[in-house]
């Protein structure tokens, strides 16, 4: 039985014991993620002193400016995940194509990740994070990444804020672990996380409301205001979703006239966050279909995202349908 204060490694081993045929491969894979994010956390804390803030002078596959800390985080994850030998392939927001580490040629899993979500906020000291999604290796090629979200073996994120916290699900609920820098360990601080069925916060960039293309969305937001909801929008998906998981409400990044297919990436942003939301008792949709039911067609595919508690999400689906 997991107890508050249990370290992440012990928790992972305890979960492994629930599966008599487990080989330990997933456990070792998760430990590799744990190790990499601890190092990233240390660099985030020192970023202002180490000349790793600002732009790296290049653009990623999305055409976005790469931040120096983004590039460092990406390299650290590639290093640790490759050396673990537990991943057949790695896909990143910062890579045009997946890489296939020599050490992972016999591995069981593939992983997609956003090394540093919200990196445009680095210079202003706002919470940022790492998001990851693990699938089973099936066909031993790029198509292993193009599996529906409900087939994820594990998903999670690490938020680098006032404290560093890793939020994880292996399909048996959601648990949060806070990094104790004194001992260098993630300790269970938020066991069995559940999103409230009804919250008081909506999180969306309302400055884009004239560009939204979902009929009924403006009316939906106005109806939440009429119910006394308050707006909280940070612009860092990890931070906004983290608050939504804990306090309830809704997080939304809808399609608009500029981004008709949505802005957030399915594989390493929308899908893992949807997995966590559903595991925590919430709902995640594009406005038209459940995010976890989408079969990806491209590694960097984008989708609209709405996720949150049952009350807000059921109301959203009803108003978008009738909008």
From Swiss-Prot:
Q: Which PROSITE patterns match?
A: FBPASE
Organism, scientific name: Sulfurihydrogenibium sp. (strain YO3AOP1)
| Gene label | fbp
In terms of PANTHER family, this protein maps to: FRUCTOSE-1,6-BISPHOSPHATASE-RELATED (PTHR11556), SEDOHEPTULOSE-1,7-BISPHOSPHATASE, CHLOROPLASTIC (PTHR11556:SF35)
Q: InterPro entries from the xrefs?
A: FBPase_C_dom, FBPase_class-1, FBPase_N, FBPtase, Fructose_bisphosphatase_AS
Q: What is its main location?
A: cytoplasm
Q: How is the cofactor bound?
A: Binds 2 magnesium ions per subunit.
Q: Does the keyword Cytoplasm apply?
A: yes
Quaternary structure, per UniProt, is: Homotetramer.
Using the UniProt record, name the top-level EC class of this enzyme in a single word.
Answer: hydrolase
Q: In which pathway does it act?
A: Carbohydrate biosynthesis; gluconeogenesis
Supply the EC number(s).
Answer: 3.1.3.11
Q: Which HAMAP family match?
A: FBPase_class1
Q: Where does Mg(2+) 1 bind?
A: 93, 114, 116
Q: Write out the similarity annotation.
A: Belongs to the FBPase class 1 family.
Instruction: Tell me which residues bind substrate.
Output: 117-120, 205, 233, 263
One Pfam assignment? FBPase
A GO molecular-function annotation: fructose 1,6-bisphosphate 1-phosphatase activity
Q: Which Gene3D superfamilies match?
A: 3.40.190.80, Fructose-1,6-Bisphosphatase, subunit A, domain 1
Where Mg(2+) 2 binds, per the record, is at 114, 117, 269
* Cytoplasm found in the keyword field: yes
Q: Name one GO biological process term.
A: fructose 1,6-bisphosphate metabolic process
Its needed co-factors are: Mg(2+)
Record key words, sorted = Carbohydrate metabolism, Cytoplasm, Hydrolase, Magnesium, Metal-binding
Annotated Gene Ontology cellular component terms: cytosol
From the Swiss-Prot or TrEMBL record, give the protein name: Fructose-1,6-bisphosphatase class 1
Q: Where is this gene product found?
A: Cytoplasm
């Amino acid at each position: 039985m997991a107890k508050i204060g249990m370290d992440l490694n012990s928790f992972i081993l305890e979960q492994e014991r629930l599966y008599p045929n487990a080989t330990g491969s997933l456990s070792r894979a998760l430990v590799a993620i744990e190790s990499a994010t601890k190092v990233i956390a240390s660099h985030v804390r020192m970023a202002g002193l180490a000349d790793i803030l600002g732009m790296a002078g290049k653009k990623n596959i999305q055409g976005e400016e790469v931040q120096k800390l983004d590039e460092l985080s990406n390299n650290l994850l590639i290093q640790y995940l490759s050396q673990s030998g537990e991943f057949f392939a790695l896909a990143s927001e910062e890579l045009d194509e997946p890489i296939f580490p020599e050490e992972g040629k016999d591995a069981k899993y593939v992983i997609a990740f956003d090394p540093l979500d919200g990196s445009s906020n680095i210079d202003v000291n706002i919470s940022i994070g790492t998001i990851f999604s693990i699938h089973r290796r099936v066909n031993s090629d790029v198509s292993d990444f193009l599996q529906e979200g409900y087939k994820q073996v594990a998903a999670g994120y690490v938020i680098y804020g006032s404290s560093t916290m890793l939020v994880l699900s292996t399909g048996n609920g959601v648990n949060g672990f806070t990094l104790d820098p004194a001992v260098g360990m993630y300790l269970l601080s938020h066991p069995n996380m559940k999103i409230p069925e009804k919250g008081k916060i909506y999180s969306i960039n309302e400055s884009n409301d004239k560009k939204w293309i979902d009929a009924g969305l403006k009316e939906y937001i106005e109806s939440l205001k009429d119910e006394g909801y308050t707006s909280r929008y940070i612009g860092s998906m990890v931070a906004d979703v983290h608050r939504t998981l804990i306090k309830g409400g809704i997080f939304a990044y809808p399609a608009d006239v500029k981004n008709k297919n949505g802005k957030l990436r399915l594989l390493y942003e929308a899908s893992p966050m949807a997995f966590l939301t559903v595991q925590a008792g919430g709902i995640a949709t594009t406005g038209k279909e459940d995010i976890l039911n989408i079969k990806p067609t491209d590694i960097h595919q984008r989708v609209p995202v709405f996720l949150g508690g049952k009350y807000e999400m059921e109301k959203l689906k009803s108003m978008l349908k009738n909008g």
